[in-house]
Amino acid sequence: MKLGLTCPRFTWPGGDSAIAGRFAAAARGADGAGLHSLWVMDHFFQIPNFGAVEDPMLEAYGALSYAAALTSRVTLGALVTGAVHREPGLLVKQVSTLDALSGGRAVLGIGAGWYEPEARGLGLRFPSLAERFERLEETLQIARQMWSDEDKPYEGRHYRLERTLNAPQARPPILIGGSGENKTLRLVAEYADACNFLHGADVRHKLGVLRAHCERLGRPYEEIEKTLHMRIPDGQSVAESVQRCGDLAALGIDHVIVAVPDAAADSSLAHLAALATQISAITPAGR
């Protein structure tokens, strides 16, 4: 079983001037602790679950590029990018650049997008849910085309590209976040290398739905990495964290991505190092 760290907050003692140093400590700490992955949210305003809207929030791909320069092992991705916030060609180029500069460690984490206040606040496109899913699917199609030898036009309902040239070439894994049964999990089965659920989802049921989509499409279910995001609260012991991860592995989760109260704290990184070591011996169900 794999362990990842997400950094959803950039609020540290010392204010804005402390962000670079503390985020660097989190990135280096995750890399040195034996974690598999490092993630940031792709938000422009802080979201309600993690703080006040006015709290500091870094742009995802700038932050990930900074982390890439400080690390050598962890994979790097946004958990997850709202597909409607960037033109698909630009997004694919950003992730391809991250992949090139990190030595092949980028992941495209993507979803339909949901946080309307930041979109309205910054004047970004925020169409209906149905259209956001249409744009997400077209973005996935464009990514696959740009990460192939098909240097040709793309024409969809919402996006038209005259030439899907992408050099340097890349093929980062695609992770789709969300648990919607009719649309999201169908897109996972058709386009993705990994899925991501939030803690609290009915994992057993959702994985059954995903398996059914895979069977219908002729996709091997085992090809897809199953990931889940959860929080580790203050005071939780390593043994308790191991138990939680083990319970998820028994359901078929391959990779747990955790948020901790302070991703740069020595105590948090020590907890994660111990957790990563212990769960590395766990084989998820179906593997």
PLM feature spans:
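Active-site mouth loops of central-metabolism enzymes
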Residues: 7-21, 81-89, 130, 170-180, ...
